[in-house]
Regions:
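Aromatic-enriched hydrophobic runs in primary sequence
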Residues: 1, 150, 177, 207, ...
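Generic structural signal for short, solvent-exposed loop/turn connectors between secondary structure elements
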Residues: 2-6, 250-257
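Conserved mixed alpha/beta catalytic, RNA-binding, or beta-rich assembly cores of soluble enzyme
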Residues: 2-77, 81-199, 272-278
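Alpha-helical scaffold segments in soluble metabolic enzymes
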Residues: 35, 39-43, 206, 247-251
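Stable alpha-helical structural segments in soluble proteins, enriched in small hydrophobic residues
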Residues: 174, 178, 245-252
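C-terminal non-catalytic interaction/assembly regions of soluble proteins
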Residues: 188-247, 254-257, 263-267
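N-terminal basic/disordered segments at the start of proteins
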Residues: 260, 265-280
Length: 280
């Protein structure tokens, strides 16, 4: 496999024939090869094994945006921009850091922390910055000038209700339309939730397989005990035993309901968001 063929190349390590060196060869940060090399060397410390880490930011002891993204479960949206930011850091430049979530830990000296306020916060200035948000619009204006790297948290849950036999494309259209109405990125979806009567619904399963996200299902009893104000339907209650599926499923997953029931072509969706923080 050529590295360019995969957005997230796998971690590749090489151990020399004497067992002296464990070399992180490919995907040191995103693939975790650097960490794995250190772990293996630690296990073989009594044999004198030494980890060999060659990524520039590690050699210089600088902040690494791709390692930071990996540790926080964030999606890198632009690898070229990530390279530009890493190169700038190695040259001693300061990078602006906008984050829509609480920040824990000490912010590295290479970053200038700003509270994200969209365009009003200067995202259209010609400067390099890292932006953490699940919103689509935040990167759009900034991308026109300078280098704005958006890191996407996977913190969105979509609750789904549908007729039996609904195909994947109809599921996708309904989910996409709802997320776009909220200016949310599809890449931010952490999972899909529904009632257990839908646990074998092929359209939903196919959508989840494509997105590589979990499909969480709950019994009518589990959904019924959820607290909140939900859009009730007598018809849905007769069929499923609970007055609402999509909204209650979101809440059952542990997410806060962000947008209530929306119907499109026989598919109902609701959108929720997990609370999270960013850790340095």
């Amino acid at each position: 496999m050529q590295p360019s063929e995969s957005m997230y190349p796998p971690a590749i390590l090489v151990i020399d024939e004497t067992g002296r060196f464990c070399i992180s060869l490919l995907s040191g940060h995103l693939g975790g090869a650097n960490t794995l090399a250190e772990e293996i060397s630690g296990l073989m410390a009594d044999k004198g094994m030494i980890p060999v880490i060659t990524t520039a930011t590690d050699r210089e002891g600088c902040f690494s945006v791709d390692e930071f993204a990996r540790r926080n479960g964030l999606v890198l949206t632009d690898f070229q921009c990530a390279k530009e930011i890493s190169a700038a850091i190695l040259q001693g430049e300061k990078i602006f850091f906008d984050c829509s979530y609480p920040v824990e830990g000490e912010v590295p000296e290479e970053l200038i922390l700003e509270k994200s306020r969209g365009k009003e916060n200067g995202l259209e200035r010609e400067e390099k910055r890292i932006l953490i948000s699940d919103r689509v619009y935040t990167a759009a204006g900034a991308a026109k000038k300078g280098c704005c790297l958006q890191l996407l948290p996977k913190n969105i849950v979509v609750g789904i209700g549908c007729r039996k036999g609904t195909d994947k494309e109809m599921i996708r259209q309904a989910v996409t339309a709802h997320l776009h109405s909220l200016c949310l990125s599809e890449e931010a979806i952490a999972g899909v939730a529904s009632i257990d009567l839908k646990q074998e619904e092929e359209g939903i399963l196919a959508f989840c397989r494509e997105k590589q996200i979990p499909f969480m299902t709950y019994s009518a009893k589990q959904l019924q005990i959820q607290m909140g104000s939900f859009t009730a339907s007598d018809f849905v209650e007769k069929v499923t035993g609970v007055d609402n599926v999509c909204e209650r499923s979101v809440v059952a997953s542990g997410a806060a309901l962000l947008s209530g029931k929306r119907a499109e072509n026989g598919v109902t969706t609701a959108v929720g968001e997990y609370q999270r923080s960013i850790v340095f």
